Amino acid sequence: VTNLSGDLAKVFLKINKKYGTDTIVLGSDITQTGGRITSGSLTLDVALGGGWPTNQWHELIGESTNGKTAIALKTIAANQKRDPEFTTVWVAAEEWVPSYAEMCGVDSARVYVVSTNIMEEAYEAVIEIVESKAIDCIVIDSLPALVPSAEDDKEMEEATVGRGALLTNKFFRKVGKASKRSLVTPERPFIGLIINQWRSKVGVMYGDPRTTPGGLGK
C-alpha cells in the first residue's frame, strides 16, 4: 500500500509485515480477480457463467449414478486437452477406474490418485496439496465414502455422533485459507470438486426430505 502517511500507513505496514505483503492492497492494484475453468460442457459452462470459478470449491451433488463422476472426469479431460501441463489430484475414497476415466477422455498418466477413505488422512493431504500451489484440479470422490478414524476404529454397534461433521467443517475452514491466492501477484489457480450424494431424512412430513452427508457441525 503506497501513498499513505501517518498512523494508517504504520498500521497497514505492520499488518502486511505480519500476515503477508498482499494482505492489504489498494483496490486499484487488484488485477488477479480469478478466472474460470471449462467444465467440458458448453451448457454447464453457460449455467456457471463461463465455467468453474477458480480457487473455489464446488459440490457435485445428486442421486447415485446420476453422472457426478462423469462431470468431474469431463472437466479434467477438457482441460488436459487445453493445457498439456494441467495436473489433477484425485482422492479415491471410493475408487479410481482408469478404463472409465479414459472413456471420458482423461489421460490417466496426468492424474495422481490418493488412495484413502480415512477422513483425516484425505483432508490433511488435500490441504497440503492445495497449499503447494502446484496443481490445477483436485477431486474428492466422494464425501460419503470418507470415514473418521474414530468411527473406523469402533465396532459396528458402537456409536460415533457428529465426528464427520466436525472434521468436515474444520477442513473447509483450513482449506479455505489454503485456497487463497494473491490479488496482485499471478499465482497458479485451481478448482476443487467434491462429489456428494443425496440422503433422505427419516420422518419428514413437510418440505424437502433430502439432505447430504457432511452435517452442520462447527
List the model feature ranges, each with a label.
Residues 84-86, 108-109, 135, 188-190, ...:
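Short glycine-/polar-rich loops that comprise or flank the Walker A/P-loop
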Residues 142:
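Walker B catalytic acidic pair
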Residues 12-13, 145, 151, 200-205:
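N-terminal cationic and glycine-rich segments that engage phosphates or anionic surfaces
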Residues 109-120, 151-167, 206-212:
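Flexible beta-alpha connector loops of hexameric P-loop NTPases
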Residues 2, 129, 161-218:
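Phosphate-binding/switch region of NTP-binding enzymes
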Residues 138-139:
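Walker B beta-strand of ABC/ABC-like P-loop ATPase nucleotide-binding domains
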Residues 2-110, 123-131:
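The Walker A/P-loop phosphate-binding site
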